[in-house]
Amino acid sequence: MEIAMVCTRVSLLILILSLCSPYKFIQSPMDFGPLNLLPTTTTASSDFGRILFQSPSAVLKPQSSRDISLLLGFLSGSSLSKVTVAARGAGHSIHGQAQALDGIVVEMCSLPSEIEFYKGGEGEISYADVSGGVMWIELLEQSLKLGLAPRSWTDYLYLTVGGTLSNAGISGQTFKHGPQISNVLQLEVITGRGEIVACSPSKDADLFNAVLGGLGQFGIITRARILLQEAPQKVKWVRAFYDDFGTFTKDQELLVSMPDLVDYVEGFIVLNEQSLHSSSVAFPANVDFSPDFGTKSSPKIYYCIEFAVHDYQHKNTNVEQVVEVISRQMSHMVSQLYSVEVSYFDFLNRVRMEEMSLRSLGMWEVHHPWLNMFVPKAGISSFRDLLMDNISPDNFDGLILIYPLLRDKWDTNTSVVLPNSGSMDRVMYVVGILRSANPDDGCSHHCLQELLRRHRHIADTAGARIGAKQYLAHHPTPSGWHQHFGRRWEQFAERKTRFDPLLILGPGQGIFPRSNNAAYGS
Ligand code: FAD
């Protein structure tokens, strides 16, 4: 044991020297004692965005939390080293957030995929203990076997638990249960100092809160305890169309005010034929709606609300009746309400069906210049106008999601940044501009740069004018990050000093660039 530790330390020293050397010599798998450190791969330097490709010098495929602790413990103990480390979940970031230029990428999916359940009795909670590299789809598949499921989701499930908890994790259930970070009971985290810490709201709460929505800056999540609830067997899934933005948002706000009846609320802008039939693979209703989209100079756009009601077969709830009660209060376009009943699994896994369809058309592995923003309720109309001034509906490829969230479902002690709540509105919105740019369809370098420039303009203008904040944020400069955090910057930076003083973690976010051997704040 002792000998193994000494070997590991010596090997790590060689590693650090090799990474700091101008002549990188990691070309083949290296024996770093028990650490499975490998030469870089193309996967480690790419992500879903396909915009940035930063190559690390090595990849760690950890077999246990201890492997990560050894690596970080050694790097944080050596002021010699400038080596940075990024945890990589499923790599579904847009702007290289899980990349580490010339550093080490820790591939979280190499951790043994452990999922353990505790099923509470009547009146007790149920939960699952899962490794940080487990994907939500795996947790769903396993938990359904026990009739259970997490309460809060993302739209797409091929994302890791550690990856979404480092951001927030939102979807149509967020209005009811809060984001995924509001549904975690406990974490195991390896800090930037290499310490393995079990933390929760009552133990090492500051680390717990820092890591949730912490953009991978304070520690690597190796385990999480996720709250579960009874899973419905089926879901009644409804879509209703609107031709007026004010009516659309008013109805969305009505729906989120009825959490006893409604289980999911989202919505999207119908810009063109393609968005009208968005995710029609998963939503197999016969949509008999042929709107007039106007002309290029005078486009007409529409809106679609999606809501869902869970169907628990043993409860004998009449979901048809529940939908009827809800929809009677809505003001959608006449006859433009469609519904389908699908299994709970298919409902949650709906984006995977779209993925398979897009893959078969060669349209999945393209550039994704996405922009997500949290918008205060008071500014949602101006945000819509800003958006429409900066996109052309006739050639927009992708989806624009808009749906309301409720502030009081978010814990403001976590690291997540929301718009200031000056007006005390309980409602805020999330808007996701989920755009594809296909080089084979004429959108290569120049076109992509132009789309990114426009998104930056939207983000900057909406930030300055209406106090909107980016979700899954990307800021090219540290000063952009200072502005993003606003008055929360000091707390974020202080937590960094405490949990990752040598600025080793999360270099791809660009929040704390590592300058010459300085610890943050020194
Ligand atoms: P990665 O991209 O691998 O990592 C993201 C960040 O987290 C990086 O900074 C990384 O260093 C850090 N990180 C990763 N693992 C850990 C860990 N174990 N511990 C500490 N830090 C870690 N998001 C939503 O909220 N709602 C949605 O509905 C939604 N839908 C999406 C649909 C698609 C098709 C895609 C591509 C993305 C979607 N996202 C959504 C965004 C997604 O939640 C984030 O991009 C998330 O980071 C992806 O998880 P990942 O496992 O791929 O993380």
Model-based region annotation:
Residues 1-522:
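Noncatalytic alpha-helical scaffold of FAD-dependent oxidoreductases
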